[in-house]
A protein has these predicted regions:
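C-terminal, non-catalytic interaction/recognition modules in large multi-subunit enzymes and RNPs
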Residues: 1-399
Length: 399
């Protein structure tokens, strides 16, 4: 106990060997556990060594670190939530995003959530830039479920929290999306089979400031549904689950802050970008073997889903290819609720592409980089407000 060894060194045990690399130390703590520490934890940000080219081992370590943070977020959300929907059905997702709202890593949660949450984060950034939302501060959390700005359907509420690392602007974002049991509307459960407008389906939120300086803004929250004809039927449970999402996001902040403190913000951002670039390369290898094709499907109500898929040169990178998915020919948005928001359409495409990959990579924004979606505004895969969307979201998620 108390013994300390500086790397490089090799520690032989009865059942294996431990490699202590240069820059690391190994010590035995009071519990007789071997603790490995990197010297970078003793540096200030200015003193940290210059970044080295990222190798596959370092990239894999960071990939698992990012995913572990998202998993910790999910576990805290499960443990602190109140509703059966989140606590037992596990209808929630947690993820990390870069400063631009690009998905970096996630826990293996709900695909339609994970592929669309980035749209919600980017919508928040756009509204901040347009002064439609106050400048973000440490301790903020905002809520959004708007299907026309990154949401899926109204019961899925996303809590978005910026992560600051000493600068004026967020360095990262963490977000959690949960399916809430009821958000008001004409039917209990907020999934009416006969809705014809988004107003029928419940509470609509777009970047509502829910937490400021770590305190719940109850006045903002209560004002958001005060004028609704049919308000949420169990507001106490809804509020409790939203507070659980805030707690989950706090777990994500803590994980990222510890990682930045240990490794430095520059290296963390470099590894996030590297993870996305690697995913993009994997998708490019996939599409290089695909052929042009088209498909059309008639639904029970006579509506048409049409798609043409083509591999074309990338205009921004002439030596690379991109996969174009053209949904022109798809029927106009329906009078009922079989309309899938563009964020759902995007999430479905992203998940299908991820399933086709042989590479073991997390779903992230890089998977979408070599893709181009052409979805006409006003069709049933990209409806305009105030279209009803609850059935389109469900059918798209199950497709």
């Amino acid at each position: 106990i108390g013994c300390c060894i500086e790397g490089p060194a090799l520690i032989a045990e009865a059942t294996g060997c431990i490699v202590v690399e240069d820059g690391w130390t190994a010590r035995v703590d009071r519990a007789a556990a071997l603790v490995l520490e990197h010297e970078s934890i003793f540096f200030t940000e200015a003193e940290k060594p210059a970044l080295k080219p990222a190798g596959p081992v370092l990239a894999e370590l960071f990939r698992h670190r990012f995913m572990a943070i998202a998993e910790q977020m999910g576990e805290r959300l499960r443990q602190t939530s109140r509703s059966v929907n989140i606590r037992e059905r596990l209808d929630f997702s947690c993820a990390l995003f870069d400063s631009h709202g690009g998905l970096v890593a996630n826990a293996p949660h709900i695909p339609v959530h994970l592929g669309s949450m980035g749209d919600s984060v980017r919508d928040l950034l756009e509204q901040v830039a347009a002064d439609a939302v106050p400048p973000l501060q440490p301790g903020d959390t905002l809520l959004s479920n708007d299907p026309f700005h990154g949401g899926t359907h109204l019961p899925d509420i996303t809590a978005i929290t910026p992560v600051f690392c000493g600068g004026l602007n967020p360095s990262f974002f963490v977000a959690s999306r949960g399916h809430h049991a009821d958000v008001g509307g004409i039917s209990p459960g907020s999934m009416p089979s006969f809705s014809t407008s988004i107003d029928d389906e419940g509470l609509l939120l777009r970047n509502l400031l829910f937490v400021r300086d770590g305190a719940i803004q109850l006045s903002n929250w209560e004002a958001s549904f005060r004028e609704m004809a049919i308000q949420p039927r169990n507001p106490q449970e809804l509020l409790a689950d939203l507070q659980a999402q805030v707690a989950a996001n706090q777990a994500g902040i803590e994980g990222l802050e510890q990682l930045v403190e240990r490794e430095g913000e520059a290296l963390v951002q470099q590894q996030m970008q590297g993870l996305q670039l690697h995913a993009a390369d994997c998708v490019r290898r996939l599409i290089s073997g695909l052929a042009d094709m088209s498909h059309q499907l008639q639904l029970d109500d006579g509506a048409i889903l049409a798609v043409r898929i083509g591999v074309l040169p990338d205009q921004q990178n002439s030596d690379q290819q991109k996969l174009v998915l053209d949904f022109r020919g798809t029927s106009q948005q329906r009078q009922g609720n079989f309309n899938a928001p563009l964020s759902v359409t995007r999430a479905v495409v992203l998940y299908v592409i991820r399933c086709l990959l042989d590479d073991d990579i997390p779903l992230n924004e890089g998977c979408f980089a070599p893709l181009e979606l052409r979805v006409p505004l006003g069709c049933m895969l990209n409806p305009e407000a105030p279209a009803a969307v609850v059935a389109g979201n469900v059918e798209g998620s199950q497709a």
